[in-house]
Amino acid sequence: GMSGYIQGIPDFLKGYLHGISAANKHKKGRL
């Protein structure tokens, strides 16, 4: 399932993706 897929992602990549989602939220908040 999705949880197993996420567990297979290295921590640095999870942090990278989290940074992207945070940036997208920040952009939407400014619009």
Curated annotation (Swiss-Prot):
Any Gene Ontology biological process: defense response to bacterium
Pfam family, one: Antimicrobial14
Function comment: Antibacterial activity against several lactic acid bacteria, Listeria, Streptococci, etc.
Name the UniProt record assigns to this protein: Bacteriocin lactocin-705
Keyword Chaperone: no
Annotated keywords: Antibiotic, Antimicrobial, Bacteriocin
Alphabetical list of InterPro entries matching this protein: Antimicrobial14
